Design a protein with these regions (language model features):
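Sec-dependent N-terminal signal peptides
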Residues: 3-12
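Sec/Tat signal peptide C-region and signal peptidase I cleavage site
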Residues: 13-17
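Short beta-strand segments enriched in small/hydrophobic residues
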Residues: 19-25
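Helical hinge/lid and interdomain linker segments adjacent to catalytic or ligand-binding clefts
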Residues: 21, 30-113
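Short catalytic/ligand-binding loop motif for oxyanion handling, primarily in non-cytosolic enzymes
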Residues: 76-77, 108-111, 117, 131-132, ...
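Extracellular ligand-binding/catalytic regions of CAZymes and related secreted enzymes
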Residues: 90, 199-234
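Class I SAM-dependent methyltransferase SAM-binding "motif I" and its flanking Rossmann-like core
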Residues: 110-151
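Catalytic beta-strand/loop cores that center a nucleophilic Ser/Cys/Thr
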Residues: 138-206
Length: 234
């Protein structure tokens, strides 16, 4: 029954022209990552469509302003997309579309996913590495931002490593307080805008509640929404 409902939902989406695409295929976690990405996309004033390998078509980009990549498993997402979908996403961005990624969505942006041999999108030069080992997560991490300290939900996300030349093309939005490693960045690829975060600004309250952790400065959904607005030029 659940599969039937999901199928009907995906079919209903195809009737309308959507201006935001959210990956909902393999690699997007099934524990609220897709729904959270959809929520902050709507908060940004956009009309999202969930995209999977089964319903993907390049024509979807004709009305889209931004591609949103949720948290989950970046390697699984890349493999499920395959070369065809990855190239279509890159083409979309280079021609002026936006890309927003949270956690796994940040891992996916570099030429290789993290420190693996899995092919990434290659829309951000540099490398991604896991901020710290998985033991003891999820957690709330203290971040350094241009506006002062901020606390973010973290669950296995990356930090970015750039050389001096690559860094000139990057606008650093936040760093991990403990290591000063780069967490969130804005940059461009061709005519398009990219905004990604190793942490989860889209995290809903129930993620914190389930893990018995507290974000002392409140939810960061507005940050996630602003990322989408900027990338979508909305």
């Amino acid at each position: 029954m659940k599969l039937l409902i999901l199928a009907l939902f995906l079919m209903s989406q195809s009737v309308f022209a959507h201006n935001a695409l959210v990956w909902g295929g393999p690699g997007a976690c099934q524990d609220g990552c897709i729904e959270s990405a959809v929520h902050v996309t709507k908060l940004a004033g956009l009309d999202p469509m969930i995209v999977t390998p089964e319903n993907f078509d390049a024509s979807l980009f004709e009305t889209a302003k931004v591609w949103v990549q949720p948290g989950g498993k970046s390697g699984a997402a890349s493999n499920a997309m395959g070369p065809k979908i990855r190239e279509e996403i890159k083409k979309f961005i280079s021609q002026g579309g936006g890309y927003v990624g949270f956690c796994a969505g940040a891992f996916l942006t570099t030429p290789k996913v993290g420190q693996t041999s899995v092919t990434g999108l290659g829309i951000i030069d540099g490398k991604t590495k896991v901020y710290r080992r998985a033991k003891g997560y999820p957690s709330v991490e203290k971040m350094i931002t241009p506006d002062g300290f901020r606390y973010h939900y973290w669950e296995g996300g990356p930090w970015f490593s750039f050389n001096s030349v690559q860094l000139k093309k990057i606008n650093v939005k936040s760093r991990y307080f403990t290591t000063k490693g780069i967490n969130a960045v804005e940059t461009t690829y061709g005519k398009g805008r990219i905004s990604v975060s190793g942490t989860h600004p889209e995290a809903p309250q129930w993620w914190y509640d389930d893990s018995h952790i507290v974000d002392i400065d409140g939810l960061d959904n507005q940050i996630a929404s602003d990322m989408i607005k900027w990338a979508a030029k909305n």
